[in-house]
Amino acid sequence: MYKLIIEDDEGKTTVVPLIRDEITIGRKEGNTIRLTERNVSRRHAKLVKSNGSVFIEDLTSYNGIKVNGDRIAGRAPVNEGDRVQIGD
């Protein structure tokens, strides 16, 4: 099973099992994962499981997404151990 480990600005971690094929991340209520930091857009990102792989997609957020320190455009694969940064 895939899982997402969320670490906030203060170093607190939360483990979220990825049981759905599509998960939205953002500041607005109604997202599967809600992050309340100001640098997170209302609808910031989407995680998609497809054919045994996981992808993250930037939903035209203002502050973007980085995978292993590199800013992505559109959609990018996410592998075990990758570090994803939402916002700046």
Where are the language model's segments positioned?
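Forkhead-associated
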Residues: 3-5, 12-87
